[in-house]
Regions:
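Basic, polyanion-binding surface patches
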Residues: 1-165
């Protein structure tokens, strides 16, 4: 008997994650998508990964662009997260954006960011893992935007609020 995918989704929804916007450039085109399936794979050598649905337009951009930036969102960036979670073209026009070393857009007001060169793509079911080598990065001050139980959340005194359970 196969494991129930909806049960897996419910279980993983109990795992609080940070919220990021993954950005990339392919030629003159830039794109971005909200992602919480982002991991630090290795410190030696430095490697990170983002998991992207094969049906998402971002999949093609990442595959062809060869680079990406992980922009970790601040607590007050819920609107940015929602913007990049929607399908279709992405509007960067009102955001402060810098071009990273790889050419990927960096959200200047992000809590932290990594600019990565794509080094490998691993097929994993209906999603692929894009492995990146960080070439540059920075951190800022503030609280992160979290995602828990299908909702945006925040840290309270070092713990996730329990009134959302």
């Amino acid at each position: 008997m196969a494991f129930d995918a909806m049960l897996q989704r419910q279980i993983m929804g109990r795992f609080a994650t940070g919220v990021t916007v993954i950005t990339t450039r392919f030629g003159d085109e830039v794109s971005g998508m909200t992602a919480n399936a982002v991991i630090s794979l290795s410190l030696d050598p430095p490697l990170v990964a983002v998991c992207v649905d094969r049906g998402a337009s971002m999949h093609a951009y990442l595959s062809q662009g060869g680079c990406f930036a992980i922009n970790i969102l601040r607590l007050d960036d819920e609107d940015i997260s929602k913007r990049f979670a929607k399908p279709g073209p992405k509007d960067f026009s009102d955001l402060r954006v810098e071009e990273g070393q790889t050419g990927a857009p960096i959200l200047s007001d992000a809590l932290a960011w990594l600019d990565c060169r794509l080094v490998q793509t691993v097929e994993t079911g209906d999603h692929d893992l894009f492995l990146g080598e960080p070439l540059a990065g920075a951190t800022g001050e503030g609280a992160p935007l979290l995602y828990y139980g299908g909702r945006y959340d925040r840290l309270v005194s070092g713990t996730v609020r329990e009134d959302r359970a």
